[in-house]
């Protein structure tokens, strides 16, 4: 019995020594391992028995404690966890992934929702606007010119895509008309009221179909085109004659094509009435939009080039003739000052004249303007009586009373001898002389 007790004591002492060493090692592992980071975040102690069961024996913590009751005395406190190499590994992986992504194109984050898209577009426009404001005048023109040329190339590509796939290989062999027939059909076409309008789409399947439907009952037809130039109208006339097989009689007023269907006209099948060579309605509209945009861009590019040349020329003149420019500006400023002073003086004179005119407009002047009816009646009553008597004399003289008898002759002879000039009688003198002449006639 004594031997057994001694052996047990030796074994327990050896086991306690081993457990102390293991506890120190386990304490270091627990402080450095990420397994117990959650435990380290909580301010509490960790018993060594739980660690021994979990790490050494790899058993569950729900094991009955009677098997390891002798380990309860040895315990340690947890310490803050140290940073391990896992974070460094994750960082290195992220950096390597970023390097790999930099080689390839960075994918833009997908925007979720309409508001996010609108917000991104607003920011993009604001950024472009600020960049444009920071540019110089020459850089602005160059930027506009670059954009215009890119737009021209893009429109040319879209125009090529909108061209019909099948090539137009149909040939036109029109009938020969005599001058009399041509005159007759042209007169008929000018009088007829049936017409086909051609809008901004130009020639497409619907226009040709409409023409054939008109030719079903009428020989002549008017094609009215108001959205193209006269040269383009002539090209459209040639194209319509080729596609429909009709005869172009005349282009009236530069916008109306008069066409004749032909002598032996028969309504063709639907494949010819709406040929695939031409564009459908939607594509014709897209082509017209591209054509208008291309025309506008081609007008805009030379204007920008001209502005750029003027700007460069102004910059060169500023470098060469800096003093001359300053003198010119000074002279212009002086001229402007003189013009402003003259205008101010003219305004002052006009104001003075207006004030003087207002002072002259007295009550008596206004009374002359606003005369009453009673005053006019008084003036009529105050008319002299001899004027009424003279009005009774005949007005027609038949050029006989120009001499006014002997008195007039004597008077005129005396004046001729004195001054050798023709007499100038007043109306009253003429009336008196005429009255005297008539009285003499009555006495005779």
UniProtKB/Swiss-Prot annotation:
* Ranges of biased composition (kind: Basic and acidic residues): 406-426
The superkingdom of the source organism is Eukaryota
Question: Composition bias, kind Polar residues: at what positions?
Answer: 92-101
For the keyword Transit peptide, the answer is yes
Supply the Pfam families for this chain. CRS1_YhbY (PF01985)
Query: Chief location of this protein?
Result: plastid
Q: Where in the cell is it found?
A: Plastid, Chloroplast
Q: Name one GO molecular function term.
A: RNA binding
Q: Which keywords does the record carry?
A: Chloroplast, Coiled coil, Plastid, RNA-binding, Transit peptide
Give the residues annotated as coiled coil. Answer: 292-355
Q: Which GO cellular component terms are attached?
A: chloroplast
InterPro entries documented for this protein? At3g25440-like, RNA-binding_CRM, YhbY-like_sf
Q: Where is the composition biased (Acidic residues)?
A: 346-357
| Positions of the CRM domain | 175-272
Using the UniProt annotation, give all residue ranges assigned to the region (Disordered): 77-107, 344-364, 392-426
Q: Where is the transit peptide?
A: 1-72
Its name, as the record gives it, is Uncharacterized CRM domain-containing protein At3g25440, chloroplastic
Organism encoding this protein: Arabidopsis thaliana (Mouse-ear cress)
């Amino acid at each position: 019995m004594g031997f057994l007790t001694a052996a047990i004591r030796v074994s327990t002492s050896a086991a306690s020594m081993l457990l102390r060493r293991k506890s120190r090692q386990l304490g270091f592992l627990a402080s450095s391992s990420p397994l117990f980071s959650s435990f380290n975040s909580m301010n509490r102690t960790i018993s060594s028995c739980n660690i021994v069961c979990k790490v050494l024996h790899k058993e569950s913590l729900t094991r009955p404690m009677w098997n390891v009751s002798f380990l309860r005395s040895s315990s340690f406190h947890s310490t803050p966890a140290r940073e391990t190499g896992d974070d460094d590994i994750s960082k290195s992986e992220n950096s390597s992934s970023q390097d790999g992504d930099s080689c390839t194109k960075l994918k833009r984050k997908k925007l979720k929702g309409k508001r996010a898209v609108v917000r991104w577009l607003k920011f993009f426009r604001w950024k472009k606007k600020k960049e444009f404001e920071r540019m110089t005048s020459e850089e602005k023109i160059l930027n506009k010119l670059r954009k215009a040329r890119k737009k021209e190339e893009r429109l040319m590509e879209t125009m090529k895509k909108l061209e019909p796939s099948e090539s137009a290989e149909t040939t036109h062999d029109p009938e020969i008309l005599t001058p009399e027939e041509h005159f007759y059909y042209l007169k008929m076409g000018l009088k007829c009221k049936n017409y086909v309008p051609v809008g901004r789409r130009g020639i497409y399947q619907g226009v040709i179909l409409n023409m054939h439907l008109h030719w079903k009952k009428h020989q002549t037809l008017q094609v009215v085109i108001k959205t193209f130039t006269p040269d383009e109208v002539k090209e459209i006339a040639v194209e319509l004659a080729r596609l429909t097989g009709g005869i172009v009689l005349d282009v009236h007023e530069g916008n109306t094509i008069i066409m004749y269907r032909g002598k032996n006209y028969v309504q063709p099948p639907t494949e010819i009435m709406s040929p695939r060579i031409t564009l459908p309605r939607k594509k014709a509209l897209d082509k017209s939009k591209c054509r208008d945009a291309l025309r506008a861009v081609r007008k805009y590019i030379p204007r920008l080039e001209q502005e750029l040349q003027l700007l460069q020329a102004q910059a060169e003149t500023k470098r060469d003739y800096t003093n001359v420019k300053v003198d010119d500006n000074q002279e212009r400023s002086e001229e402007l000052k003189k013009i402003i002073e003259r205008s101010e003086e003219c305004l002052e004179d006009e104001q003075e004249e207006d004030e003087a005119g207002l002072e002259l407009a007295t009550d008596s002047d206004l009374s002359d303007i606003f005369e009453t009816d009673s005053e006019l009646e008084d003036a009529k009553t105050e008319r002299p009586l001899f004027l009424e008597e003279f009005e009774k004399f005949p007005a027609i003289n038949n050029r006989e009373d120009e001499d006014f008898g002997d008195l007039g002759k004597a008077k005129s002879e005396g004046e001729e001898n004195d001054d050798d000039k023709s007499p100038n009688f007043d109306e009253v003198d003429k009336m008196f002389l005429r009255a005297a002449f008539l009285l003499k006639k009555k006495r005779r």
